[in-house]
Amino acid sequence: MSFHQVEEWFEIFRQFGYLPGFILLYIRAIIPVFPLALYILINIQAYGPILGILISWLGLISGTFTVYLICKRLVNTERMQRIKQRTAVQRLISFIDRQGLIPLFILLCFPFTPNTLINFVASLSHIRPKYYFIVLASSKLVSTIILGYLGKEITTILTHPLRGILMLVVLVVFWIVGKKLEQHFMGSKKE
């Protein structure tokens, strides 16, 4: 696939307006198959940095909050009760209930934390939906801006190799910090 073909795909994407970019991130929040940075990069390339980040953020928080509300609705089902009994989930619920919303905000700010698990746990905790939405919206704005900036910089790797190296270092640091936070809050993986 050539650069010209990629540009044609972005042009087709743009012709459908902002809805495809929104739907792309909405579905990605519900079914996290590919890296979030990839979807944000697609939106930035299609709509520009500011609109791309805004559309990505709106799609991401809409999809993530939808998952949260579905889980909240199903909290008393047998399957959710079994999930709630897991040690890692109990530990995270207890931590969120004790410490409040700030640790949740910090966890959700990092692009490489398991958002699906955090959604499940938040729906099982005693956090009210409106407070979770505020934390979700603000933390995902931070996360989307970070990923959007890093994604925007991907196009300059060839012209400015030092920026590419710096971007790679920042991504690795985010990944390591996210994994450390995940281990700290969720305990061992031997469950």
UniProtKB/Swiss-Prot annotation:
Q: What is this protein called?
A: Putative undecaprenyl phosphate transporter SAOUHSC_00901
Q: Which InterPro entries has this protein been placed in?
A: TMEM64, VTT_dom
Q: Which GO terms describe its cellular component?
A: plasma membrane
The transmembrane segments are: 22-42, 50-70, 101-121, 131-151, 157-177
Q: Where in the cell is it found?
A: Cell membrane
In a knockout, what does one observe? Deletion of the gene does not affect amphomycin minimum inhibitory concentrations. The triple mutant lacking uptA, popT and SAOUHSC_00901 is not viable.
Q: What does this protein do?
A: May catalyze the transport of undecaprenyl phosphate (UndP) across the cytoplasmic membrane, from the external side to the cytoplasmic side.
Name the species this protein comes from: Staphylococcus aureus (strain NCTC 8325 / PS 47)
Give the protein family: Belongs to the TVP38/TMEM64 family.
Per UniProt, the keywords (alphabetical) are:
Cell membrane, Membrane, Transmembrane, Transmembrane helix, Transport
Specify the protein's topology with respect to the membrane: Multi-pass membrane protein
Q: Name one Pfam family in it.
A: VTT_dom
